[in-house]
């Protein structure tokens, strides 16, 4: 007998609320897919939304990162390294290192968890999920006045 787990889709919306004039200028939409619907997952979703608001990831992971963004960043890095006067082998290692740093800083799963910087977001997700799986389906971060 095949037992299908009910997949619960949780969507979090968090707006930064500050007193005075900055009320609601930043928002995050986060869609999670998980078989759990408990307070731990709900609290984690809120924390993850705050992570997104604070760190402005460009995508969830490397696979979903826009190839044009990667290409432009690679061109910038190559030009920078070329001007440094290093030999080809060292230049290649520097380029790879800088590109990996860019990817880690701009993809949500590879970012350092703001509340525990020694861990990455993907490690925190594994800890919260336990045996079950939490999947990030979609993230949207918006700021008043920015194009979406």
Task: Indicate residue ranges for each PLM-predicted region.
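N-terminal assembly/interaction segments in proteins that build large macromolecular machines
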Residues: 1-148
